[in-house]
Amino acid sequence: PGTAAIYSDLGYLLLGLIIERVAGVGLEEYLAEKIAGPLGLAEGILYNPPGKLKKSRQAYFPTENCPWRGKVLQGEVSDENCWVLGGVAGHAGLFGNIESVLGLTAAILEIWQGRRVHPHLPREVLAFFLEARSQVDGSTWALGFDRPTPGSSSSGRYLSPRSVGHLGFTGTSFWIDPDKELVVVLLTNRVHPSRDNNLIREFRPYFHDRVLELLGLV
């Protein structure tokens, strides 16, 4: 402990189980009632999309051709560990459209800045996670969130050092910049039809640079 910063799903998978034990309800229900619900996003940020929507291309784009399940996934979690757990886990499994993800990240920014109150997410708790500094020298990680790495970050060149964000394996990401008062969300299905496509690594920083350039925030 304290010697290296290692990205791992296991801690947040365990955290999801702890939340269920303490709250006395499933993580899916907890998300809907305690986090997304008060923001009006219970139908936009969710686990396990309703069956009737899974095959609607207007609702959920296909992702990868999964050898385990013998089909192209659509409206079904890509992460294998989350799938084994029924599609609900602390580290993976969320679905959302651009409006809902923007709404969630904008709410995080507003709560962080003290401009919005959430009944179950006090600013002090949120700031503890977003502003935490790793005890490991050279690590950019906060608690559950990444920060820009000089010269090599997916956030590009222009977001402030206090920015926080996270990437999704299927080709998604968000970044929240408290100094520029900006949130940037990218939703793609880069694993369709195969997870071998890694061009997203070049596209993400380019995308963020272009967004900030077009907004005049460079």
Regions found by a protein language model. Give the residues of each.
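Short, surface-exposed loop or secondary-structure junction motifs
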Residues: 1-161
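Short loop/turn motifs at secondary-structure junctions and domain boundaries
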Residues: 165-168
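Short, surface-exposed beta-strand/loop micro-motifs that present aromatic residues
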Residues: 170-183
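A short acidic/small-residue loop/turn micro-motif
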Residues: 190-193
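Short, flexible/disordered intra-domain loops and linkers
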Residues: 195-199
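Surface-exposed amphipathic alpha-helical segments
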Residues: 200-218
